[in-house]
Amino acid sequence: MPMTNGAAPSNDRPEQLDGFLEECGVFGVFGSDEASVLTALGLHALQHRGQEASGIVTFDGSDFHAHRALGHVGDNFGANSPQMRELRGHIAIGHNRYSTSGNVNPFMEIQPFSSELAFGGSRWRITAI
């Protein structure tokens, strides 16, 4: 059976594929002091979903901690690596990148992304009150 990329059919570009293709891998943990380690293990298990880059962000109740890098999970998130020691928190989410498009600078495309919002001169921080 022909596969499509999920886009509307187009007469200009028939999108028929021979089989399944992999897409990015996402893994998260909530409520564990080892959230970053468990997330790195989960991303390692999902490495086939993206081999170009990986990133993890954690939350310790007051601050976010993130690390992103080109390459495989095992090369960047070893159990005793400085990066893992900095990823403190009980909540973590990670991403393996499988690019289908992107920037000339591949580092700019590694998730997770972060941003801040300012409105009317005030910075907004989203936390529980």
Label every PLM stretch briefly.
Residues M1-I129:
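N-terminal glutamine amidotransferase
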